[in-house]
C-alpha cells in the first residue's frame, strides 16, 4: 500500500544526493540547496551554515514538495535528519518551522537520528550539532521521534550492512501504523481501526517507536478452528512476546513511567486476533506505563506472524537527551573560556539558554 504522497531528499552535497537508490532522480525529488555557497560539497558539519542555507532556499524546497500528487490531502509531514551532520541538523528545524507557518493545522513530525558512539567521542562538533538540532526541533515540531543508531549496531558486521540493517529496523515499525487507517479492502479493516486521528492525538514532544513479531505455527486448512485451551494460551503468549520485543527494541531507551501518551497496534491474520488478546496487550502496556493515555487498534493481514507496534510519546525525561545538553553546555563554556570570556559553573537550567536555536 502506498501511504506516502511523496518522498524528497534535500542536501547541500551532490555526492550524497547521487548515492540515493529509491528516491526519484529528478531535481524536484533530489533537491540541492546552497549550491552557490558550497559548490555542492556540503557544509562541513557547520550546522549554522546549514540553517542559513535552508532559510535562504526554503521556497525552493516547499515548491518541490507541493508538486506531489495529493499534497493537500496529506494528514501530516514527516521530516528525517541525522543530528550530527551539518545540513540535516541545521535545516530540519528551519523547514519544520516554515511548514508549520504555511500549512496551519497540519502536524509536522521530525525524526532525529542520533550519532554513533564513536562519532561522539572522536568528533567534538557532533555533540554541539546534536544538542542544537534536538533543541531546535523540540521547540517547533509537533513531535520528535528519537532514533538511537547505537542500539542497532552489530559490531562485527561490515559498515554498509550495518547501515542498511539499521535503516530497515528504523523504518519497519512505521509501516503498519501508517497503513492501518488507510486500508480500503474490507478484509483488512480492523474491528478497532487505528487511524490518522488516533496517531495525531498521540504524538507530542519526545517520542519513541518499536516493533516486535512472533511467528505463527503452520496449520493445515482442514484442521478447523482452534478449540484446545493450550492453543488459545499459546496465541496470547505469542502476542505478549511480540509486545515485549517491541518495547525492548524501542528506538531510544526510556522509562515508560515517564510516558504521557502511548499506542499499540496488533497486526495478524484475522482468525488469530481476539478481544482477549487485545485486552491482554492493553493490560501489559498499562502496567508498564501507568500514567499514559493509551490508544490501540488491530490490523488484520494475511501473514504467518503476529506483529505489534508500540509508540510512546509525551516523554517527560530522556536521560540521553539531557546528557547531550549537559555536554554541549560544557563545550560552549570551554569555547568561551578559550576566547577569554571566562568559565563559570552553573546549573543545567541556567545554562540551557546558551545552546543556540537554529531557526
Give, region by region, the residue ranges found by the protein language model.
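Tubulin/FtsZ superfamily GTPase core signature
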Residues: 1-359
